[in-house]
Amino acid sequence: MSRLRWLTAGESHGPALVATLEGLPAGVPITTDMVADHLARRRLGYGRGARMKFERDEVTFLGGVRHGLTLGSPVAIMVGNTEWPKWEQVMAADPVDPAILADLARNAPLTRPRPGHADLAGMQKYGFDEARPILERASARETAARVALGAVARSYLKETAGIEIVSHVVELAAAKAPYGVYPTPADVEKLDADPVRCLDADASKAMVAEIDQAHKDGDTLGGVVEVLAYDVPVGLGSHVHWDRRLDARLAAALMGIQAIKGVEVGDGFELARVPGSKAHDEIVQTADGVRRTTGRSGGTEGGLTTGELLRVRAAMKPIATVPRALATIDVATGEATKAHHQRSDVCAVPAAGIVAEAMVALVLADAVAEKFGGDSVPETRRNVRSYLDNLVVR
C-alpha cells in the first residue's frame, strides 16, 4: 500500500499548475529556490522550442511548509504560468461572452487532431468537438508540477536515507553514448552545462548534429534517458504482490511521462538476448559486505532493491507536433488535411531526464516512507540506521 499520495491539476495555458504531496514527515528541508532550481533544469536542452525562452515558473507554497521545513501535513505547490494574461479569456473558468471569444485568434477551434497526441482519442472519449480541452491537460507542461513535487521528494530521500538521483541522455536518434559510463552526483553540474545533458563529449556533439539536421528537415527526434539512484538501501519494495514490486512501480511512473513509450530496468531488453550465465549478478563477500559483481539487474531483484546502484532507462518517442505536419482529418468537415501545428520543440529528451528524475524520486520516497515510516525526519533517519545496522545478512 502506498504511503505517499500525489496529484497535479491545471492546464498548459491556465493560470497555474497545482501539485499536492501527502505523507511526508515533518522536517524535510525545502524552499522555493530549491524547487525553482529543478524547474530551471527542466527547461534545459538543445532543440527546445520558443516557449522555453520566455517561460518562467513562479513557485509558491500553498501549504505544508513553514520556514523552509515540511510540517508533516500535505504539501501544496503552485507553479504560476507567466503566459496567463494572453490566455485569460480563452482559458477562463467562468463563461465568457461569445462575441469576445469570436474575435480571439487563440480561441479558434482546433479541429485537425495531431497524430501521436491525445487529441482525437480524447475528443472521442470526452465528447468534445475540438482538441483544446484535451491538449491543454495532455501537454507536457504538466510535468512542471511533477518536477516541483520531485524536488521535495529528493530532499526527503537525501535527508533520511542519503539517496541521490542523477540522469543523463544515453541515446538521441542515431547518436549513442558509450555504454556503462555512469555519472555520479558530482557530475550533475557538468551534465546540466552540456547542451544535451550527455556525459560523453563526442556523443554530445553527434546528438547536437542530429538535432540540427532534424530542425532543417522540419522534423522531431526522440531518445533514451537513464536515471541512476545512488545509496539506495536493500529491501525497498516487495516480492509478495505484483503492485508492490519496486521495478513495477518505477516502470509505471516512467511510462506516465508524456511521450515515453518504453522502460527498462538495468540491462533490460539486452538480458533477453544472452544466456542466463551472462544475465545475472553473482554474489560475493567483500570487505564492505555482501555485494554483486555486476549491475545487470539495475539494482532490483524479485521486486526488491539489492543495495546496489539503481538504474532505469526510459525511451522517449519523437515529439508528435511535427513542423511539417502529418496527415489527419478535419473533424468538422471529415475532409483529409494536415494536422494543426503550433510552436514546439525539435527535441525534449534532455528535459525528459529531469522529469524522469522526479518520478524516480517520488517512487523511491514512497518506498522509503513505506519501509521506514516516521513522523519526523530524525525518526525516519533513526529507523533507516537501525534497519541497516541489524540486517541478518550484511
Swiss-Prot record:
Record's keyword annotation contains NADP: yes
GO BP annotation list: amino acid biosynthetic process; aromatic amino acid family biosynthetic process; chorismate biosynthetic process
Amino-acid positions noted as binding NADP(+) in the UniProt annotation, renumbered to this chain: R42, R48
One GO CC annotation: cytosol
EC identifiers of the protein: 4.2.3.5
UniProt keyword annotation of DNA-binding present: no
Membership in a protein family: Belongs to the chorismate synthase family.
Name of the protein this chain belongs to: Chorismate synthase
